[in-house]
Amino acid sequence: MLERIKVCFTESIQTQIAAAEALPDAISRAAMTLVQSLLNGNKILCCGNGTSGANAQHFAASMINRYETERPGLPAIALNTDNVVLTAITNDRLHDEVYAKQVRALGHAGDVLLAISTRGNSRDIVKAVEAAVTRDMTIVALTGYDGGELAGLLGPQDVEIRIPSHRSARIHEMHMLTVNCLCDLIDNTLFPHQDD
């Protein structure tokens, strides 16, 4: 058991090192995309399933409340949090449309969809991205593995942050770290603080 624990930590560290080498440009582009949307008076819609949904909620909560320092709230909506809306849509047997319907109702040109999917193949996330494209929204996608179907939907203005791993647990860990990086970059760009 102790050896298995060491393996988990070692894999996580190795994935972080690989991501630190591969992802800074994509994370920087994503942060600037989010910042520009907010500066233009737009909002960020976020979606994901399971642990990816928790990461989407964490991002939205960090925008609306704060990340590490006090600042005004920023407009972000996690589409996986309203149980009444979610169950109304799925009750009509529209499981794949659970986020797309919300994107079509709430999204506008200039808004950003933060789509989080470990493999990039979740039908409801793919449909949300397709809906965002029809609304002239920009997409920031957090993926893993080979990016899946989601990666193929992205245009030149969109940003994919693909975790260099084929282990779901490691991808989820790195998605959380990436969300924290994005929150930090957004805060420090919009509300730079002086170190005394």
Swiss-Prot record:
The keyword Ribonucleoprotein does not apply. Keywords: DNA replication. Coiled coil: none annotated. One of its GO terms (biological process) is DNA replication. Residues 34-196 form the SIS domain. InterPro entries: DiaA (IPR023070), GmhA/DiaA (IPR035461), SIS_dom (IPR001347), SIS_dom_sf (IPR046348), SIS_GmhA/DiaA_subfam (IPR050099). One of its GO terms (molecular function) is carbohydrate derivative binding. SUPFAM superfamilies: SIS domain. Pfam families: SIS_2. It comes from the Bacteria. Required for the timely initiation of chromosomal replication via direct interactions with the DnaA initiator protein. Belongs to the SIS family. DiaA subfamily. Homotetramer; dimer of dimers. This is DnaA initiator-associating protein DiaA.
